[in-house]
Amino acid sequence: MEAILAEAAAMPWRRRAGERSLRREGRIWTLWSIGIVVTFGLPAALLAWIEPLAFPVSAIFLGHGIAVLHLQARRGAGGVKPIGNARQPAERTALGLLGDLVGHDSRELLDETGLALQRGRLGAWLVGQEGAILVRPGGHRVHCFCVRVGEGGDLPAGDRVAHLLLALREDEEGFATVANRNFSGATWRLWVEMPERARPALLEARATSRTGGR
C-alpha cells in the first residue's frame, strides 16, 4: 500500500492529482492561452486590415497579449526559487545533506542550478525552495507548482528543498494535489523566463522525462 501524504489526506475536498487530471489541466491552460491570443490577436488583425495605417496600434495591442503569455510563464518560473550560493555554515551543511539525499547523479546539477532533480511516475520533477516544476513524459509540457514548508521560514534553503523532496518521494500524486499550480504550458515558454543559471536543470529534466525510468 502506497503512503499518502498527511497534507493531502487533510484536504479531502481536492481531487487527487494523477495522469487524467494533469492532462485535463494542461488542456485548460492551452485553451486559456489560445483565448488570450484570439482576444488580442483577432482585433489587432482586423484593425490592420480595415486601416493599414493603424498597424502600429495593432502591433501594440497584440504586444499586450504576448506580454500576458510571458507573465504566465514568468509566474511559474518565479515560484520555484532555486537555492542560492551557500555562505553561512548552516546553509553549507544543509546543502551537503541535500546533496547526499539526491544522490551522485543529481548532485552536480543541484550545485550548478540550485534545483533538485527527481524522477517520478508523473514525469521529471525539479524541486526548489518554494515550489516544483513537473516536466511531463515527452518533455513538451510543464506544470509549475507553488508549495512551501510549513513554518520553514527559518530553515536553511537546503533543508526546505529536502523537506519538499521527501514529501514528493513519499506521495507524488499527493504532492501535486496539495501544491498550487501557477503555470502549465510548453517547456520552451518556461525556459525563456527562468534564470539563466537554472535553465540547464530544465533541459536535464526534459531529457529525463523523454527517457523515462526512476
How would you describe each model-predicted region?
Residues 134-214:
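Cytosol-/stroma-facing membrane-proximal "stalk/adaptor" domains immediately downstream
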Residues 12, 25-30, 52-53, 65, ...:
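Non-catalytic accessory regions used for complex assembly or targeting
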Residues 6-9, 63-123:
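N-terminal topogenic membrane-targeting module
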Residues 1-27:
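Cytosolic juxtamembrane N-terminal segments of multi-pass membrane proteins
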Residues 115-117, 124, 131-137:
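Short polybasic amphipathic segments
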Residues 1, 14-15, 103, 158-159, ...:
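Short amphipathic alpha-helical segments that mediate assembly, nucleic-acid/protein binding
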Residues 45-61:
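Hydrophobic alpha-helical transmembrane segments
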Residues 25-49:
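Canonical alpha-helical transmembrane segments of integral membrane proteins
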